[in-house]
């Protein structure tokens, strides 16, 4: 089973950017731990981060025929990007939306997601553990639903 983890804008700054909200762990440490979890579950996890919407759209397109599931923390693009939504729907690969912070406990403009209504599930508010919970949920979903 091949899974793709997508991280959007500013997530490359984890560990430096607003640690009170996003935690002190780096994206690299989150990805390393998640790869280990995926391997233990019999899956391969590929990670990709970009601050550019078009690069994320292109990487989603490249997942056709290669990835069985997608984990996506689109960052601020969650609340603005119809392009990411259309790309995810276009490839028809099951995906889980995830966030480090509870977006519903933050500013009102963060309450709207263009991705959530078509996602297998949404995990938010558990810090770095959101990634692990999203991975577990996606793997379980794929095993149950082929």
Swiss-Prot record:
PROSITE patterns registered for this protein in UniProt: DEHYDROQUINASE_II
Binding site for substrate: 73, 79, 86, 100-101, 110
Pfam families: DHquinase_II (PF01220)
E.C. numbers: 4.2.1.10
GO biological process, one term: chorismate biosynthetic process
Site residues (Transition state stabilizer), renumbered to this chain: 17
Keywords assigned by UniProt, alphabetized: Amino-acid biosynthesis, Aromatic amino acid biosynthesis, Lyase
Alphabetized InterPro entries for the sequence: DHquinase_II (IPR001874), DHquinase_II_CS (IPR018509), DHquinase_II_sf (IPR036441)
Transmembrane segments: none
Catalyzed chemical reaction(s): 3-dehydroquinate = 3-dehydroshikimate + H2O
Pathway(s) where this gene product acts: Metabolic intermediate biosynthesis; chorismate biosynthesis; chorismate from D-erythrose 4-phosphate and phosphoenolpyruvate: step 3/7
EC class: lyase
Active-site positions on this chain: 22 (proton acceptor), 99 (proton donor)
Molecular function via GO: 3-dehydroquinate dehydratase activity
Subunit organization: Homododecamer.
Assigned protein family: Belongs to the type-II 3-dehydroquinase family.
Matching HAMAP family: AroQ
Function: Catalyzes a trans-dehydration via an enolate intermediate.
Name listed for the protein in its UniProt record: 3-dehydroquinate dehydratase
């Amino acid at each position: 089973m091949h899974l793709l983890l997508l991280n959007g804008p500013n997530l490359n700054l984890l560990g430096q950017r607003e640690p009170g909200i996003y935690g002190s762990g780096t994206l690299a440490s989150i990805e390393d731990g998640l790869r280990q979890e995926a391997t233990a579950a019999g899956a391969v996890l590929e990670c990709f981060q970009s601050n550019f919407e078009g690069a994320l759209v292109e990487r989603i397109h490249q997942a056709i025929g290669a990835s069985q599931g997608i984990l996506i923390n689109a960052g601020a693009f969650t609340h603005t990007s119809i392009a990411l939504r259309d790309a995810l729907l276009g490839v028809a690969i099951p995906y889980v939306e995830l966030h480090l912070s509870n977006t519903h406990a933050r500013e009102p403009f963060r309450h709207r997601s263009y991705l959530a209504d078509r996602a297998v599930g949404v995990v938010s508010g558990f810090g770095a553990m959101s990634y692990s919970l999203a991975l577990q949920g996606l793997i379980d979903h794929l095993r149950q639903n082929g």
